[in-house]
Amino acid sequence: MAFLKKSLFLVLFLGIVSLSICEEEKREGEEEEKQEEENEELSEEELRERRALLDKLKSLGKVVGKVALGVVQNYLNPRQ
């Protein structure tokens, strides 16, 4: 009877240990997923910022081009 009792305790102990290890791995996996999601969100946010910056540069380039064109036209065809 004592042998059976020890075997049962051993099985229960090993089951609890393996269960706790699985729970720990699950928590680590969830933490890694959260970090990956945060990194993806940062990447999407950075992309939005870059697109906004490129749009501003594009607008600035158009304005500078129009000003330069006006200066060149005034130089070539001066008003008298």
UniProtKB/Swiss-Prot annotation:
InterPro entries: Frog_antimicrobial_propeptide, FSAP. It holds the Pfam family FSAP_sig_propep. This is Raniseptin-6. One of its GO terms (cellular component) is extracellular region. Residues 1-22 form the signal peptide. It comes from the Eukaryota. Has antibacterial activity. Residues 23-49 form a propeptide. The keyword Zinc does not apply. Expressed by the skin glands. Belongs to the frog skin active peptide (FSAP) family. Dermaseptin subfamily. It comes from Boana raniceps. Keywords: Amphibian defense peptide, Antibiotic, Antimicrobial, Cleavage on pair of basic residues, Secreted, Signal. One of its GO terms (biological process) is defense response to bacterium. Its main location: secreted. It is found in: Secreted.
